[in-house]
Amino acid sequence: MNKFEDIRGVAFDLDGTLVDSAPGLAAAVDMALYALELPVAGEERVITWIGNGADVLMERALTWARQERATQRKTMGKPPVDDDIPAEEQVRILRKLFDRYYGEVAEEGTFLFPHVADTLGALQAKGLPLGLVTNKPTPFVAPLLEALDIAKYFSVVIGGDDVQNKKPHPDPLLLVAERMGIAPQQMLFVGDSRNDIQAAKAAGCPSVGLTYGYNYGEAIDLSQPDVIYQSINDLLPALGLPHSENQESKND
């Protein structure tokens, strides 16, 4: 029995699922840290912080940077820095800087993963409504989807500022299902992180976990999605469509 035979709509996470956004996010984080005269983190480290929205990303970046600065100063025999600005205020300042820099680098630092456009097109052609649920700040979402030429596939888009409770809370997924006019159990949610799978479980949606995303360095199977796929186009046979073999470059 096909466990997805009752699916009437599909919703996707964005970062780490449809797009590799780490280059742009890491560049903006590092520029913001540098502007505050803090150590820069680098893409490999920033990848482990992605997934809970920009505010949490800033908190993680600042916590690491302050600790790294303290370690560096101790190694050099220098006294620790006595911060005049409380950490909460530094997070707020860092977020404002990040938003400015990310607006400059988001498009050039974000790429579609292979098979994304073909898969979205095939699902849309089948008549399935498609939704997007991301914790990314809402103002960045629509321009990015347009630049990547995938905005046309989505009938519902929920950004991080569109709901009070972000993933892993179920509210964003429940809102998408409501706008699609279907029950949560009829909406398949596809993501790459434990936040995605936890949100799907809490909302009552069947879930697909993809192995190639970020997920804080954890294997997606630890979150126990209903199905695990290596590639996004593995969705197609599960939903009664032929498997797409068209290759798309990372820079498409």
Curated annotation (Swiss-Prot):
<comment type="function">
    <text>Specifically catalyzes the dephosphorylation of 2-phosphoglycolate (2P-Gly). Is involved in the dissimilation of the intracellular 2-phosphoglycolate formed during the DNA repair of 3'-phosphoglycolate ends, a major class of DNA lesions induced by oxidative stress.</text>
</comment>
<feature type="binding site">
    <location>
        <position position="13"/>
    </location>
    <ligand>
        <name>Mg(2+)</name>
    </ligand>
</feature>
<feature type="binding site">
    <location>
        <position position="192"/>
    </location>
    <ligand>
        <name>Mg(2+)</name>
    </ligand>
</feature>
<dbReference type="GO" id="GO:0031404">
    <property type="term" value="F:chloride ion binding"/>
</dbReference>
<comment type="subunit">
    <text>Monomer.</text>
</comment>
<dbReference type="GO" id="GO:0006281">
    <property type="term" value="P:DNA repair"/>
</dbReference>
<dbReference type="GO" id="GO:0008967">
    <property type="term" value="F:phosphoglycolate phosphatase activity"/>
</dbReference>
<dbReference type="GO" id="GO:0005829">
    <property type="term" value="C:cytosol"/>
</dbReference>
<dbReference type="InterPro" id="IPR050155">
    <property type="entry name" value="HAD-like_hydrolase_sf"/>
</dbReference>
<dbReference type="InterPro" id="IPR006439">
    <property type="entry name" value="HAD-SF_hydro_IA"/>
</dbReference>
<comment type="pathway">
    <text>Organic acid metabolism; glycolate biosynthesis; glycolate from 2-phosphoglycolate: step 1/1.</text>
</comment>
<feature type="binding site">
    <location>
        <position position="15"/>
    </location>
    <ligand>
        <name>Mg(2+)</name>
    </ligand>
</feature>
<keyword id="KW-0119">Carbohydrate metabolism</keyword>
<feature type="binding site">
    <location>
        <begin position="13"/>
        <end position="15"/>
    </location>
    <ligand>
        <name>substrate</name>
    </ligand>
</feature>
<keyword id="KW-0479">Metal-binding</keyword>
<dbReference type="InterPro" id="IPR037512">
    <property type="entry name" value="PGPase_prok"/>
</dbReference>
<protein>
    <recommendedName>
        <fullName>Phosphoglycolate phosphatase</fullName>
        <ecNumber>3.1.3.18</ecNumber>
    </recommendedName>
</protein>
<dbReference type="InterPro" id="IPR023214">
    <property type="entry name" value="HAD_sf"/>
</dbReference>
<dbReference type="InterPro" id="IPR023198">
    <property type="entry name" value="PGP-like_dom2"/>
</dbReference>
<dbReference type="GO" id="GO:0000287">
    <property type="term" value="F:magnesium ion binding"/>
</dbReference>
<comment type="similarity">
    <text>Belongs to the HAD-like hydrolase superfamily. CbbY/CbbZ/Gph/YieH family.</text>
</comment>
<dbReference type="GO" id="GO:0005975">
    <property type="term" value="P:carbohydrate metabolic process"/>
</dbReference>
<keyword id="KW-0378">Hydrolase</keyword>
<dbReference type="GO" id="GO:0046295">
    <property type="term" value="P:glycolate biosynthetic process"/>
</dbReference>
<dbReference type="Pfam" id="PF00702">
    <property type="entry name" value="Hydrolase"/>
</dbReference>
<keyword id="KW-0460">Magnesium</keyword>
<feature type="active site" description="Nucleophile">
    <location>
        <position position="13"/>
    </location>
</feature>
<dbReference type="InterPro" id="IPR036412">
    <property type="entry name" value="HAD-like_sf"/>
</dbReference>
<keyword id="KW-0868">Chloride</keyword>
